[in-house]
């Protein structure tokens, strides 16, 4: 866990975590307000789950396509003292030893993940970093996401209750707290292409507008982009006289091959209609605004976003 230089912060800073870097490229201009930047700095969350390798391959393919720097991030997520107090284990007597043991086991488990990451970035000739940090996974990933253009994470899914809670926290916290878009990869399926045929979910909201702006580098390189309005409201306070046509025209001015479409689906939820439409047109990526709110000190997804996260069949690009 050595370092090529210190542009990301000192190694002994617990908030920064340990990291290594190869062939560090010049920094690109970050987005300021609503302006658009290229996709040049990516983070992928990696762990010991079977789907970690799928996330890595998708992230590496996108990084290669866009000439992006790729950071692999592994979080050593161990419980704090409240976990032991709540479970009836005296923290002073046995909790510290147990935490230390868990920490050591997770650090050891990160080694094959790191080896896989290094093999893939070498194969794809990518500039890269490997990072490992300790803390709450969602908070740590969200913190480091602020220094990137896109974060690749996994869809929450694990039979272990604590693990699915942790994976949900990663997605929700990163999306709602980092100010950066998230690419969520489904827990099942193979995805040989991501971003060739993109389906944009359009409802004329600020979240959807932000998603289109954030995804512009991907949309520009797509072979086909379909902009879909579900159950559109016509008129100046809705989706316009021709639903989704205005945003499709805006995309065309950016060199995006976009077409407008709309569908009426009053018998199913909007999220389900979106996933069904994506399947019908063989889209390999969905771009959508991410909606969420606070509830009992927690960040939770809104209805459509929650449906997408629970039932996704293709990778989903979300912005908040």
Language model: regions and residue ranges:
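Structural beta-alpha unit
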Residues: 2-37, 51, 77, 111, ...
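Small/aliphatic-rich secondary-structure junction motif
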Residues: 6-8, 13-97, 177, 190, ...
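A short acidic, glycine-rich active-site loop
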Residues: 94-111
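Glycine-rich, Arg-bearing micro-motifs that act as flexible, cationic patches
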Residues: 153-173, 195, 288-310
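Short, flexible loop segments at boundaries between secondary-structure elements
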Residues: 313-320
């Amino acid at each position: 866990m050595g370092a090529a230089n210190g542009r990301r912060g000192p190694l002994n800073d617990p908030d920064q975590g340990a990291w290594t870097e190869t062939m560090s490229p010049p920094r690109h201009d970050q987005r300021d307000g609503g302006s658009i930047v290229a996709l040049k700095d990516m983070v992928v969350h990696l762990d010991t789950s079977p789907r970690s390798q799928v996330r890595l391959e998708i992230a590496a393919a996108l990084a290669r396509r866009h000439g992006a720097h790729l950071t692999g991030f592994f979080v050593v997520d161990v419980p704090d003292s409240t976990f032991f107090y709540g479970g009836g284990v005296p923290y002073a007597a046995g909790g510290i030893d147990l935490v230390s043991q868990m920490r050591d086991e997770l650090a050891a488990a990160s080694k094959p993940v790191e080896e896989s990451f290094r093999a893939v970035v070498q194969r794809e000739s990518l500039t890269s970093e490997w990072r490992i940090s300790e803390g709450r996974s969602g908070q740590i990933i969200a913190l480091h996401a602020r220094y990137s253009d896109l974060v690749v994470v996994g869809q929450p899914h694990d039979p272990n209750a604590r693990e699915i809670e942790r994976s949900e926290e990663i997605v929700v916290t990163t999306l709602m707290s980092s100010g950066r878009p998230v690419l969520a990869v489904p827990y099942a399926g193979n995805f040989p292409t991501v971003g060739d045929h993109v389906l944009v979910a359009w409802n004329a909201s600020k979240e959807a507008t932000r998603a289109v702006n954030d995804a512009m580098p991907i949309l520009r390189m797509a072979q086909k982009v379909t902009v879909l309005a579900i159950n559109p409201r016509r008129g100046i306070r809705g989706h316009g006289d021709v639903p989704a046509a205005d945003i499709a025209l805006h995309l065309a001015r950016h060199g995006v091959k976009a077409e407008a479409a709309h569908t009426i689906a009053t018998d199913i939820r909007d999220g389900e209609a979106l996933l069904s439409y994506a399947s019908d047109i063989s889209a390999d990526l969905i771009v959508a605004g991410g909606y969420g709110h606070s509830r009992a000190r927690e960040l939770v997804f809104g209805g459509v976003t929650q449906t997408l996260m629970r039932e996704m069949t293709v990778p989903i690009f979300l912005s908040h």
